Design a protein with these regions (language model features):
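Catalytic-site microenvironment of enzymes
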Residues: 1-225
Length: 225
């Protein structure tokens, strides 16, 4: 089951949190609307890539019966109508995303973004996590699967999310933020715009979550770094 949030005068969840048992996955496609996020060296807009991967991830979860909430399912911002400037819209959008997440009972958040850097040499996925030990096992599993599926030479480790990331620092649940690749790298820029690669990314993210969930259900602890 998937539930969508739409921009309203004051964005409210269009679902009743009590309908969902523990285990609902919130899929957050970063940015949206006027806030396009980063722009790749070829002109691709981050928010569109985030959304494409998020929709594919949602579809895969649907095949496995994983209940999901998509914070957005189109190129929109979740800001209040009273927000006028781009800054006001960004702030309102983030606050409404936080409110929607916090209204749920123990969700797991997967926030999808793309990276960029002044140098074009950097590439590869990076997983960040919020709320310390609560999210670290899922972050470890996700980083490991991304390495296995996408780039065996990617030796990045899951990292605590920077304090500057508003959404991840204002929610209390299990949450990871996945920078799927670098839009500033020519090869990865093209890959991230590819339908096949987006499917590969979504499959890796879904597989990581499902294997993590199975591990937790067995009472095992993910200690691998």
């Amino acid at each position: 089951m998937t539930v969508y949030l739409q921009a309203q005068t004051a964005v409210q969840p269009t679902f009743s949190p009590t309908r969902f048992a523990e285990g609902v996955v919130v899929i957050d496609a970063g940015h949206g609307g006027e806030d396009g996020g980063a722009v790749s060296i070829s002109g691709a807009v981050e928010s569109n890539i985030n959304l494409a991967i998020a929709l594919r991830l949602d579809a895969i979860f649907g095949l496995y019966g994983v209940p999901t909430v998509l914070l957005r399912d189109s190129d929109i911002s979740l800001h209040d109508e009273q927000a006028n400037t781009l800054r006001e819209k960004k702030v309102s959008d983030l606050k409404n995303r936080v409110a929607a997440i916090e209204a749920l009972d123990e969700p797991t958040v997967i926030s999808i973004h793309q990276n960029t850097y002044p140098s074009s040499k950097y590439h590869g996925a990076q997983v960040f996590y919020a709320n310390g030990e609560l999210s670290l096992p899922l972050a470890r599993q996700t980083q490991a699967v991304l390495k296995q599926v996408l780039d065996p030479e990617n030796d990045r480790m899951p990292t605590a999310v920077p304090s500057s990331v508003y959404l991840m620092n204002h929610i209390s649940c299990k949450a990871i933020l996945v920078e799927c690749g670098f839009l500033s790298n020519p090869e990865e820029d093209q890959l991230l715009q590819s339908s096949d690669y987006q499917k590969k990314l979504a499959t890796a993210l879904a597989g990581a979550y499902l294997s993590y969930r199975e591990t937790v259900s067995k009472g095992e602890i993910l200690n691998a770094s």
